[in-house]
Amino acid sequence: MKLSCLLLTLAIIFVLTIVHAPNVEAKALADPESDAVGFADAVGEADPIDWKKVDWKKVSKKTCKVMLKACKFLG
């Protein structure tokens, strides 16, 4: 039970990291008979987080609610 909640916590952190990461766009161009040419553009469109203005009490309450629901669902 505790291990599944720990794994769920890590999964939530991983998903939040992806959601708050800047957009990355990758494209590949190729002709039918030639080698592929690829390029990648990283566009930082995410707003920077002002850690001083984060309401940690609200964040922890919401995280706990999600964790409790998930643990009840899994257990």
UniProtKB/Swiss-Prot annotation:
Gene Ontology molecular function: any one: toxin activity
A GO cellular component entry from the record: extracellular region
Record's subcellular location: Secreted
Signal peptide: 1-26
Pro-peptide positions on chain: 27-48
UniProt keyword Lipid metabolism, yes or no: no
Residues recorded as bearing Leucine amide in the entry: L74
Tissue expression summary: Expressed by the venom gland.
TM segment ranges: none
Keywords carried by this UniProt record: Allergen, Amidation, Antibiotic, Antimicrobial, Cytolysis, Disulfide bond, Hemolysis, Secreted, Signal, Toxin
Biological-process GO terms, alphabetical: defense response to bacterium; killing of cells of another organism
Biological role: Heterodimer protein that may serve both defensive (pain-inducing) and predatory (insecticidal) roles. Has membrane-disrupting activity and shows induction of non-specific calcium influx into cells,. Shows broad-spectrum activity against a diverse range of bacteria, and cell lines, as well as hemolytic activity (EC(50)=2.18 uM). In vivo, shows moderate insecticidal activity against D.melanogaster and potent anthelmintic activity against the veterinary nematode H.contortus. In addition, intraplantar injection into mice induces nocifensive behavior and mechanical allodynia.
General remark: Dekan et al., 2017 and Nixon et al., 2020 report synthesis and functional analysis of heterodimers with different disulfide patterns as well as different A and B chain monomeric forms.
Subunit and partners: Heterodimer with M-MIITX-Mp2b (pilosin-3b) (AC P0C023); disulfide-linked. Only heterodimers (and not monomers) have been identified in the venom.
Protein name, per record: M-myrmeciitoxin-Mp2a
Source organism of the structure: Myrmecia pilosula (Jack jumper ant)
